[in-house]
Structures are given as C-alpha cells and as structure tokens.
A protein has these predicted regions:
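N-terminal pre-domains immediately preceding structured catalytic cores
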Residues: 1-67
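Active-site-adjacent loop/helix surface patches within enzyme catalytic domains
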Residues: 28, 46-178
Length: 178
C-alpha cells in the first residue's frame, strides 16, 4: 500500500531497472517493434485491455472506493480486505520466464515472484488487484514460486538439465539455454 518493508532478502520492485513491471502495457519480451499495445492486441488473442490488473473494489463502500481511486489504500484498510496469500508453483523455471508467460502470453499478473536464488520480484503494489486467482483476486496477494514443475518417475531428463553436480559433488542449479 505504497510503503516499503525491509525483509532481509533482496527485493526488486517494478520501479527498479532490473524489475518486472506489471503496469506496463507493452509486452516485455517481444521484439521492440512488435511490443506496443497496438501490435500486442492483434498478436495475443487473450489481450482485451492494456492493463493486467484492476482495482480492489469488492466489499468497499462508495467512500472507500473514492479514497482508493483518489489516493490509494492505507495499510489498515488493505489489511481488513486482503486476507489470503495464493501461492502458485509456476513450472516456468525462473521468474523471468514466469513473467514472460504471465504478462506477454496469458495477459495476467501477480504481486510477487520468488526466484531460484531467493530474490523477490514485486511487479505491482499490493493495493492493486492482480489477475492470478480468478474469484480470489480481490482478497489475495499472488505469489509465483519459481520451479521446474513436477515429473513422473522415469522422467529424469529435466532434472538432469537443471541440476548438475559441481566439482565437490554438491548439486547446483544450471538454467538451460532455450
């Protein structure tokens, strides 16, 4: 709700140069000449609006809606209306790939992405209604947790690509080039 909280871990917001910005209308990973709203709405069938988020207004009085629209949420009001964390296991491997899929291809958003190295990326202010959990969007904070997904026994190829042993025998993550 417009306030920064120190967490003890690296947090990169949508305002930082290396952040992921769910406020942007353009597709982040499309070639520049194909990333504008005008070209994106033709290229991506799911894209009906330049926004990938909305106003948290369900359960608010008319006066509260005007407060939120005019100056944003105060922390007590946000705490009163938001009571869920929705954790998504994205199977995209990294936060970068997750944002690409959510923002550029599926026209969705999420508040936070937790990357493999522990970095937290915040793509929207918590005052926004991210589009990640359909009917729970208004009352929830959306968090994507980077991982490669679940695989049936015998499907070791993905694990062999992503997890290798270093010189001392310890496992390490190696992001495949694709």
């Amino acid at each position: 709700a417009g306030q920064l909280f120190h967490t003890g871990t690296r947090v990169v917001t949508w305002m930082d140069p290396s952040g992921y910005d769910a406020y942007r209308c353009e597709r982040r990973f499309a070639p520049f000449d194909q990333s504008s709203w005008e070209t994106s709405k033709v290229a991506v069938a799911a894209l009906k609006t330049p926004n990938r988020y909305g106003l948290r207004k369900d359960g608010l009085t008319d006066a509260q809606v005007e407060q939120v629209r005019g100056g944003g949420w105060d922390l007590p009001l946000l705490r009163d209306k938001v009571d869920q964390f929705v954790l998504h296991f994205d199977a995209s491997g990294t936060s970068r790939n997750c944002f690409k899929v959510l923002h550029d291809h599926r026209c969705l958003s999420v508040h936070f992405m937790l990357d493999l190295d522990g970095t937290i990326y915040q793509t929207l202010d918590l005052k926004e209604r991210a589009w990640h959990a359909t009917t729970s969007n208004t009352r929830s904070i959306g968090i994507e947790i980077a991982n490669i997904g679940a695989f049936a026994p015998g499907q070791q190829r993905m694990f062999e690509e992503w997890y290798q042993r270093d010189d001392t025998g310890w496992p390490r993550v190696v992001i495949p080039t694709r």
